[in-house]
Amino acid sequence: MDCPRCNVEMESLEGEDISLQRCAECSGVFIDPGDLNRILLRNGLPVLERLGGKANLEEIAVTCPECSVDLTVVEGNDKLGLRYETCESCGGIWLDLELDEDADMQTVETAIVELFRQFRG
């Protein structure tokens, strides 16, 4: 699967009960909503559907690396300008994260948790 930002092959990261695709160039992560919800729940956060946020239908996002549909931008915490992008077709989630090139699954999971803690405001 190619990164929707960089068009380079993303690497698969596998955890105990989670898998995701990560771009080593831009640190973007593509994750299934079920896997994302498992991360959120085990870290004391509500599931994605309960986090809130608002769809920004004006902004054109990248296309889904899974099914090539335009992703919808969801914005939260206006003060910090946080956002994620979601696919209305397959449900996949794209996250722009700041990670080292050699980040492991635990590091990625920690970055995801921090993003969504701040997303709630």
Features from the language model and the residues they span:
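A cross-kingdom feature marking solvent-exposed beta-strand/loop segments within repeated
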Residues: 4-21, 46-49, 71-82
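Short metal-binding segments enriched for Cys and/or His
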Residues: 29-44, 91-107
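A broadly conserved sequence feature marking short terminus-proximal activation segments
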Residues: 18-57
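Short amphipathic alpha-helical linker/capping segments at the junctions of internal repeats
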Residues: 43-57, 105-121
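Short, solvent-exposed interaction modules
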Residues: 50-96, 101
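N-proximal short alpha-helices
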Residues: 9, 37-40, 59-60, 73
